Each structure stands twice: as structure tokens, then as C-alpha cells.
Amino acid sequence: VRQVGIIGLGKMGYNLALNMIDNDILVFGYDKFINKDLIENSKLVVLTKLQDLVTSLARPRVIWMMVPSGETTENLIDELGRMLSPNDIIIDGGNSRYTDTIRRYKYLKEFDISLVDCGTSGGVNGARYGASLMVGGDLEVVKSISWLFESLAIKDGYAYIGESGSGHFVKMVHNGIEYGMMQAIGEGFDLLEHSHYELNYKDVARVWANGSIIQGLLMDVTLSALSKDEKLTSIAGRIDDSGEGQWTIEEALKLKVSIPVIAASLFARYKSRDDLLFSEKIVASMRNEFGGHKVYKKK
């Protein structure tokens, strides 16, 4: 029986684990914070110590990390580097910055441990029933565990991208594209909202989600949200970002590549958090000064 250890049993990690179990893989799971209600209903073998996960797996070990990028991933790589044996394989399925991935790959190489980067898309549903996987790392290493990626991916949803970091690089660009597409959908509905027509947004989204050129997962989730609350009255229009959009833009600046749509979509997210509206106040005051245009006073 093939075995995989999975570290990080949040929404994505837990659903990937269930996907593995459906594919007859024996899965050992570890997380610092375990949701017992979720875990008790599955065939997942849950361990409370990282060392126990490592010792439970047959060698060469395959460990899939599904944890937040940055410091959490960094610390985990350090710990695993000390615990694992030569020829073991770590898969980073999170949204790590590709430059960090290359550095970690080189660090683990000193211990003859392989790091494979796997850009993972498709959300929670994809993790559970078939994900989109962009994989980077040494070709021979990736070939040796291609059975795992093929098991977890939707049909035609897995590709070996290239050398270390390339999987995370392609996922970063994917997320940048996602920002731009989401912003365009948001702006379209904003225009509908300001029109003189009394529109049923759920009907609009349903039609757009079925057979139109702009159909797809993002329109499907828009329809799902509007079906619950057509005017989104319960939601504040504040949008967070998880870093990949910024990394995409930084890469474009470095390579001198023009990506105005992705850049504008990230800046729109920043603006959504701006309660001061200071730039708007500056522009309004300039118009007032040079042209006597009206300014609106605070009530």
C-alpha cells in the first residue's frame, strides 16, 4: 500500500487527505491544531507529534506540506531537514514564493532530501475531488511520485512544469490572472448595479455561468454567492490579498513586463481597505482650488 504523510489538516490539507484515501493511499496526518469532529469520521491516521508522523512512514518517505507560506513553511522545512533521511521527498503544496522554494530546495539537497513544489488550484472542492496541479522539481524525483499527482488531479489537471520553483512560479502567475478576472467580474456587476434597470443579478450570473464566453469557476462561485444574498447586503466590500498578486507584479517590474490589469486589480484590493479616502479628498480639493468645483463637506 502506498503511503503519504500530510502536514496541515486545514480545509485544503484535510480534503487532499480524503482524496488520497479515496485513491487507496494510506495517509498519516499531522497538524498542531486538529479539528477532532472532522478527523474522527475518516480513515486518516492522525498523529499528534511531527516526529511520530516521520517514524510512521515507510522509507523513502513522501510528505506533503499544506501549510501557510512564509515563516510556517520555513520552520517546518528546518524541522523536517533534521528528521528525514536521504532519498525522502517533501512536497510543498502551498503558495510559497518561488525564490524561497529554490533556496529551500538547495538547503534540503545538502541532506539528500528532495523538495518538490506543487502549485495547487481548484479550491476546497478541487482538493477533495480533483485538483489542478503545477509541479516543479527534479524530473526523476517527480516521475517517482507521479502516481500521487495523477491520483489527486482532475483529468488533464496535472503537469510537470520544470526545475525547482517553476511549479510555484506558474501558480503565482495563475493567482495574478485570477485577481484580474475577479476584478473584471466585480466591475461588471458594479456597472449593472448603477444602471437604471431593475436587474435580478442571480439570473444574470446564471446565464453568464452557462454557455457564455465568460463562464467558468469564478462565475459559478459568483452565482453561488448571489443565490444566498442577491444584493450582498451582509458583506463589507473589503478585499484582502494573500501576497501572490504582489509577487506577480514585483516579478513583472523585475522583468520589465507590462501587466496593467493584474496591477490594477491588486491596487483595487488595497483601495477597498482605505477608510480615509485621502487621495479622493486631495483630488476633490484640487478641483475646487483651480476650477471652483464643488466639494462635499462631512456631515
What is the predicted function of each stretch?
Residues 1-61, 87, 124-127, 288:
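NAD(P)+-binding Rossmann beta1-loop-alpha1 motif at the extreme N-terminus of oxidoreductases
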Residues 9, 65-66, 93-94, 161-162, ...:
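Glycine- and other small-residue-rich loops at beta-strand/loop junctions that grip anionic moieties
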Residues 23, 111, 255:
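Conserved dinucleotide-binding and phosphotransfer motif residues
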Residues 33, 44-102, 127-135:
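Rossmann-like NAD(P)-binding element
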